[in-house]
């Protein structure tokens, strides 16, 4: 099993598959040894709560979610990552990888097919450029999420937490308050 917090191991696997980061996808991979376990804990991943992860990356967060015991359905749009994911997550039998864009997914169908009647949470490390669209997609889905746990850039967090009517408010400010 890969040590996701060892930069040299991560580099080696990326080099093995001749992977280059895509600026257009806003890719960055978590390697901090404390962030992913904490996110998995906060989102409530467990036998009683399944998780939909948006953006598998190389599987760092995915593996931490899976270690909590429940089913993880993870979606990745970058085809160049598929063989890497197959290798890095091969030891887990509670992960299903969907090769698709989360924004084009039928989340209700995925939940019915994969989680039956369990609670479902969302967990993701979101690129800046797609944070608001993804959050809006999740909020407007009509699904009763157990929770939505995301890592986002400070600028987006500031906009989400802004007081209505202030300079840095945006549609996401009001949407979070409405759906809250």
What residue spans do the PLM features occupy?
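Catalytic cores of RNA-modifying enzymes
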Residues: 1-180
